Amino acid sequence: MKALLDLFKQTQGDEQFDVIKIGLASPEKIRSWSFGEVRKPETINYRTFKPERDGLFCAKIFGPTKDYECLCGKYKRLKFRGVICEKCGVEVTLAKVRRERMGHIELAAPVAHIWFLKSLPSRLGMVLDMTLRDIERVLYFEAYVVVDPGMTPEGAMKRGQIMSEDEYIAKTEEYGDGAFTAIMGAEGIRDLLRGIDIDREVETIRADLKATGSDAKIKKYAKRLKVLEAFQTSGIKPDWMIMEVLPVLPPELRPLVPLDGGRFATSDLNDLYRRVINRNNRLKRLLELRAPEIIVRNEKRMLQEAVDSLLDNGRRGKAMTGANKRPLKSLAEMIKGKSGRFRQNLLGKRVDYSGRSVIVVGPTLKLHQCGLPKLMALELFKPFIFNKLETLGIATTIKAAKKEVESQTPIVWDILEEVIREHPIMLNRAPTLHRLGIQAFEPMLIEGKAIQLHPLVCAAFNADFDGDQMAVHVPLSLEAQMEARTLMLASNNVLFPANGEPSIVPSQDVVLGLYYATRDKINGKGEGMVFANIAEVIRAHEAGQVELASRVAVRITEFEIVDKKAEGDARFAEKTKIYQTSVGRAILSEILPKGMTFEEINKPLKKKEISRLINTSFRKCGLRETVIFADRLLQSGFRLATNAGISVAIDDMLIPTSKERIITEATNKVKEYDKQFMSGLVTNQERYNNVVDIWGAAGDQVGKAMMDELSHVDVLDRNSKTVRQESFNSIYMMADSGARGSAAQIRQLAGMRGLMAKPDGSIIETPITANFREGLNVLQYFISTHGARKGLADTALKTANSGYLTRRLCDVTQDLVVIEDDCGATSGVTMKALVEGGEIIEALRDRILGRVCIGDIVHPDTQEVIVANDTLLDEDHVDQIVALGIDEVKVRTVLSCLTRFGLCAKCYGRDLGRGGLVNVGEAVGVIAAQSIGEPGTQLTMRTFHIGGAASRALVASNIEAKSNGALKFSGTMRIVKNAKGEQIVISRSGEALIIDDNGRERERHKVPYGATLLFKEDAAVKAGASLATWDPLTRPIISEYAGIARFDNVEEGVTVAKQVDEVTGLSTLVVIDGKRRSAASKGVRPMINLVDDKGGEVMIAGTDHPVNIGLQVGALITVKDGQKVEVGEVLARIPIESQKTRDITGGLPRVAELFEARSPKDAAVLAKVTGTVSFGKETKGKQRLVITDMDGEANEFLIPKEKQVLVHDGQVVNKGEMIVEGPADPHDILTLRGIEELAIYIVDEVQDVYRLQGVKINDKHIEVIVRQMLRRVQITDGGDTAYITGEQVERSKLYDANDLVIAAGKRPAQFENVLLGITKASLSTDSFISAASFQETTRVLTEAAIMGKTDTLRGLKENVIIGRLIPAGTGLSYRRARKVREQFERDRAQMIAAEEEAIANTPVEIEAEVIAPAGEADPS
């Protein structure tokens, strides 16, 4: 009893424990927790409001309702503490014990715990080896279960057998009364459970496992073995799943609150408990009265149902409802779901010392400041003010101080100023999608009621001033203030952690001002003047002698960085130079920090340029200078924009002159297609696709014409010649600078609105030819409203989906922290530039920046080391590597990091948000999840229908060289020469490479099967030359051998049909679909065999397989029977489906699909081994493909007939090569090609989605997620470890176990990699607290309780839930220091004990000598 109370005592100081264990409570345990039995269903007396004795709120059991006062009021005050009143039996103590003291109910009949019955898989069913249906029938009194066969003959009846009422009666008559025992209800199940000998069961199952060969049985046994072993190791008895005692929750946790008007609000649990008590008491009475069996049975069933409802209402049958027909909230519902205990109260708490208000812009603030309304500050900093008032002696008590503050005397404001100085506060804007959503600022007191926010941090908060609100939090403790100041201050967070780009980029007005000031103009006022310095320029400008945009020459003094190591001015060298520039740029150059050249701003500053400028400043001049520079840029931008006075008029929207013509042409083309459709030349779908194409193209043409007219104007220069210059049109300037609007929006204003989509996403074929300047008619307006509304609906959906993705990502990575500097890994991944279709999508520079290299990087010519092994590659290194034209670099990656239960800094590389090597303790997992989740709302939700123009654009028919060099072919390329001497490609995965003069690969192209190569290997090619061509609409089948074609099973009307071309009148044979053939010819496969002149079969080179070429459905046969066939000749062509509009999952769903590792529908089939392909006997709808490996072992695949098989008889394929077309399955890639290939696949696919939206995310974030998806392995052979085959284990745990086994000289376990989707990976984590707070709480807790799981509190989430510092950042070092300290204390205690023992055992004379050496060793 006492032990339990100690568990609930308020902790004094830091309660130190390292693990939390969960298990099942035995009846004795429940009774030991309890302070008394609850016998009555009464709650409180409605007149006196005092709790009823022995009821659900009984003060005797649960403690007094008022502090230090018994119920009858005999004992009051502190002096009677601990006394038990003899009149009312209440102990005099604190009232808050009512939050921790439990009671119990002694059940009149045992009851099964619903979680272990109904939570799938049913644990009761597993242990008893019975079906859930049977157990339910017994528990709910529909059937008997045999507990003891007794005197019945051998084999007539066995223990655990189920029998219905009628059978029971029949058997009783047959064998006599009392010959055997069969019971109904939980008692029967309990007796069965008690009769199980777990050790023996485990042995039998292990023996069965060894003996059996069937997969289904192995699975079944393994499941049961797992549950039984769990009971064995945890020491939990199976019969505890049946409850004889029910614990009662402390009353304060299920309160009863009086409302005005004499009514009460109560927790649903009280209702549920009342039902249990009522039914239990009634059952007790019935048993005492020896009521008829049927009545007792019904009451027992009702008791079981009442307890079920209390534990998990609605899990079985109908949910119990209260008076208002609403289902009652049971214990299970209290903890699960969004509003359950875990997510509502433990992971998301409300915070004291916080406030919220609307934000307004604060253009005069410095970057690290924010404006805080005085009244808000007064409320938030109250305790500090009280303290100050007392220390100054202005107020004597807190009460007086409170009065002083409330009257807001002048002294209070002075003290507020003082208290607030240098005390950072945190601002947060919901939704907090990444770590920059909370930043610390120094408050400046302001009048008014709105918080002022610095404009430059808006990008990070994603805030604007259209009514956004922000919350303020005050860090109270000194440590918290220090962390807020050093880690969270806005001026210390200038880079996005997602991609390392600056986050303090100006936008809108500022960009417009800077752009306007740095544009130059032909023939402006004062053009051609020369100035000695910037002061002169300013003077001339202010005197009105020169315009802001005039082109002038200025002498400018710059400071170049010469010595990076030096401090202060010693770093720079001064140099002066005359620049051709504009007045605005010269004036702006004043704000450049030292170390930046004038070249950097001697161009029109668009948004991208400004971002680059800030980035350069950060890398060259450091954080402090950059922050000052950004602030100055902001001030200048605002000032210049104001002075510029840019405004917009309707006349600025120029409608292109060619618009009418383009629209007329398009209309005529559409009419032409309508005619063709009417006369039946094209299908309706084709007509629709073409119409949509035409209008799409017309819209683009109008847009282009408009931009051309808008962007340039003709002006006279100084010599009165007409020249074109960029226009100063306001709308164009806004779009061009990146301040507001885009070309697409201007197109709607001044071009044509173009095609609109219906709500279902399909495109309406009549476009809106008008623009907003001309105005829309009613029909056009109506069509437009569709799109606008769909946009809003989509956004709402998207936000929810994106948030859910972020939550899953955070959950899977939450425990990944950098825990050491270097793991010593020597493997990594070789990075190259990303090339698609011969174009570089991502340069090598961006891919290796901020990574640690493996091995020295040497100069390609001189072989001298430029970058040493294990160096973090920064901008300078990368520039050097790129300049030397090195095109691949091996770098460390998160996936090959050897650190267990974490990561090392070297494998992670640069911390993108700070710019140096990542610190130990950084929670890189959560950062990765935020970086991927945060842009989620910008991704699209829809599935793209690709049809018409879009799909036609996808069909390439040749490869063009992009650069000069020598042509090389990859090792997988196989070529034959045909009769014309052309080179025909007969490999599926061949690649053509172009190598430059230095021997470096410039580009790489995939060459499809059947393509004709136009150059020989090693030929020199020029940029723009065509390397290979092919027919994009058909796939050929090419003969690799010469001979005479002999048809096999090619019968007209049976397997092939004659098709006559309408235009040419030529006939060809087409293979018909098996489904459309007659029954007899269903399984027959048409083939072409090659025979030589003598009629013998031509064999495949190096084998004894004849050359049989199978023809697929739809193949057009181009040779005749008996025709002579040359090498490289086309035997048949398979038309590619005229690019059906296929759906491409894009955007958010695609990202989710990749991270959930879902196998795609109709996935590609990859070869499991390297070997030779042949076709076996076909089944009804499938063809059998056999790959025979080098040892002669055959691997069979069954492939649906309608699938495109990419290989043919006799072809040699490599392991992991695609043999059937389709999207790749990540699981196959992992098993056949390994972790590295899988990572490359997932990273590339995810990046494709984000790149399409123009979002930059660093690869390493995606790699971090992939590492977490691979964190479990499957045991293939347990070796001498405790693991069984087929079990899934945490990788780090297995490595640890293997180390121990190897050290002992035994056999380690063998395993294979498993890829888990993020949801599954989160749920399979070793921490049950983390898994339970994520999803499927009931299942997770049920499983954990049976296994008696311990949670080692390794992740961040578990620690947040139990309320201690997270093991990341400062928390990690705190925890390590504590461990060291504890170890030291232990060692010291041992030494002292050893000394004392030594002293006790030593003869007295030589005592002095013994103590001396021990004294030296004392660590203190």
Curated annotation (Swiss-Prot):
Positions contributing to Mg(2+) binding: 464, 466, 468
Keywords linked to the UniProt accession: DNA-directed RNA polymerase, Magnesium, Metal-binding, Nucleotidyltransferase, Transcription, Transferase, Zinc
Annotated positions binding Zn(2+) 2: 823, 897, 904, 907
Task performed by this protein: DNA-dependent RNA polymerase catalyzes the transcription of DNA into RNA using the four ribonucleoside triphosphates as substrates.
NCBIfam families: rpoC_TIGR (TIGR02386)
Recorded family membership: Belongs to the RNA polymerase beta' chain family.
This protein's name: DNA-directed RNA polymerase subunit beta'
Lineage: Bacteria, Pseudomonadati, Pseudomonadota, Betaproteobacteria, Burkholderiales
